Amino acid sequence: MGTMNHRPSRTPNPLRPASGPAHPDADRARTTARALAAALGVSGVLHLVRPAVYDSIVPRVLPGPARAYTVVSGVAEIGIAAALLSRPTRRLGGTLAAALFVAVFPANVSMAGRSVRSGRASSVRTAIAIARLPLQWPLVSRALLVRRAS
């Protein structure tokens, strides 16, 4: 009998996409990933350099100090931005970005509610706070596109 050529089986790497034809939305997903990474990176840095702005929108019902939520969310945004920029971790980055956008939605609702109830907030600030609410869902959708096509 001839010798059999056996290759050791490779365990698939969950961070590396399987080879094969590119997803039809791969180019759009890559561009979207870069845009999301830029937005998340800037927002994450702002959380760390101007935390008081974000402390004020942490829902009061959450236990513990608002600053802890501000710092953790800022670090998470920077980490997710990095994951979105790296091809091997882009799929994970899309998943985490979608989860983050859903997780921060209560803070956006809280900010809009406080802005409406407060007579001190400018009408422009109130309009921005309210306009952000429906815009959160396209962000989730774009992050899921990155996940799906990466």
PLM feature spans:
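Short amphipathic, positively biased membrane-proximal segments
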Residues: M1-S150
